[in-house]
């Protein structure tokens, strides 16, 4: 068969796919039906390629790096859960691939190679990490460009890690990839957790990817379903939720993680159709949503998608969201020591307001906003953290 016969290539794209204590045995035995259910497994079995974000190093050693945030890992035996979803492609451009250092990522890459599992998005250096993945079948070529925001795991010219999003390189990389493919899909690992809309800057980045030739841009990492924007010649999905990531850390975020989206892509030489398949979290993994559940999920999704058609809404919603988070960021400037916490309690949790005034807020804004101060401040902090 060749493309002239009208072949339709079908892909399913899921987001974060992580074994945890509750379902680890199912991964190790490759019992994928117990993880995803019979109906969902049927969809994957009919797919030309199943794409997921491998949000965890697969390693038996414990070599955690210094970072702010959780160091995830999963035993190498859990590889069988992924292998059971062949044909599979795993993306590694995320904020956890280097959680257990060079050792953990090296073990992961070697394990994927041993089990003949396609992957991209991380490597020995940025040159290796930025290499796209091209999937071709029946004359249809789809290129995947994978990148992650800077959060302790990105590669450099000389160090191992994930492909970093870079405003000087990433858009040009997508433009070059499009010249060799029929279609380009960008998987951008970024955006703020548990926020269902794009920030103004994230929206600009994603639109720029489309301007450079991307047919589909999916923002992963937010752990919740966001909103969709059909922009220019492409589609942007600002958050699709987890695929399987049954973490106790989500105990206070059940409303966000209860449902997710699979993104279905049906491509021919002449068309590229994108649709959403709602799924629901279960105790052990995930399953296809019922008709009523799917209606509930998609109705809310479509409402949010209507909201972001208004540029003012995108700006105002993000301003309001920032108001709920800024104190958390500022607390780091006064420290976490027991003495500080005790004094803060003594002053009715208002120590920050007493220590930081208008001048301090303006200075912090300048240090973060001005390119020269931002670069110098960040370099200095990194130097301190390496001592």
Language-model-detected regions and their locations in the chain:
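Active-site-proximal beta-strand elements of phosphoester/diester hydrolases
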Residues: 10-16, 141-149, 185-187, 237-240, ...
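Active-site neighborhood of phospho(di)ester-bond hydrolases with catalytic His/Asp-centered motifs
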Residues: 13-15, 50-55, 87-95, 118-123, ...
């Amino acid at each position: 068969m060749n493309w002239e016969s009208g072949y339709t290539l079908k892909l399913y794209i899921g987001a974060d796919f992580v074994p945890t204590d509750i379902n680890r045995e199912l991964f190790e035995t490759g019992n994928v039906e117990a993880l995803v259910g019979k109906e969902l497994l049927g969809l994957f079995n009919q797919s030309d390629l199943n794409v997921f974000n491998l949000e965890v190093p697969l390693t038996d050693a414990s070599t955690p790096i210094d970072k702010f945030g959780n160091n995830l890992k999963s035993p190498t035996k859990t590889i069988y859960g992924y292998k059971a979803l062949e044909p599979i492609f795993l993306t590694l451009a995320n904020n956890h691939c280097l959680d257990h250092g060079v050792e953990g990522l090296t073990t992961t890459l070697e394990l994927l190679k041993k089990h003949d599992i396609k992957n991209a998005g991380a490597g020995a250096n940025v040159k290796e990490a930025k290499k796209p993945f091209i999937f071709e079948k029946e004359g249809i070529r789809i290129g995947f460009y994978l990148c992650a925001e800077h959060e302790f795991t990105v590669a450099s010219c000389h160090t191992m890690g994930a492909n970093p999003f870079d405003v000087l390189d990433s858009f040009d990389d997508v433009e070059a990839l499009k010249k060799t493919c029929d279609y380009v899909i960008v998987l951008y690992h970024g955006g703020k957790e548990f926020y269902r809309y794009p920030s103004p800057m994230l929206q600009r980045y994603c639109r720029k990817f489309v301007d450079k030739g991307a047919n589909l841009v999916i923002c992963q990492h937010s752990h919740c379903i966001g909103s969709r924007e059909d922009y220019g010649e492409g589609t942007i999905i600002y958050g699709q939720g987890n695929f399987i990531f049954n973490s106790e850390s989500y105990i206070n975020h059940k409303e966000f993680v209860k449902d997710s989206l699979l993104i279905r892509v049906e491509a021919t030489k002449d068309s590229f159709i994108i649709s959403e398949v709602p799924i629901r979290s279960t105790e052990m993994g995930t399953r296809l949503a019922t008709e009523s559940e799917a209606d509930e999920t998609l109705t809310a999704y479509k409402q949010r998608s209507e909201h972001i058609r208004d540029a003012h809404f995108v700006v105002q919603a993000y301003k309001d969201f920032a108001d709920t988070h800024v104190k958390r960021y500022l607390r780091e400037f006064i420290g976490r020591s027991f003495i500080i916490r005790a004094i803060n309690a003594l002053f009715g949790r208002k120590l920050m307001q007493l220590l930081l005034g208008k001048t301090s807020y303006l200075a912090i804004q300048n240090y973060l906003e001005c390119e020269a101060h931002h670069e110098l401040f960040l370099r200095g902090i990194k130097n301190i953290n390496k001592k």
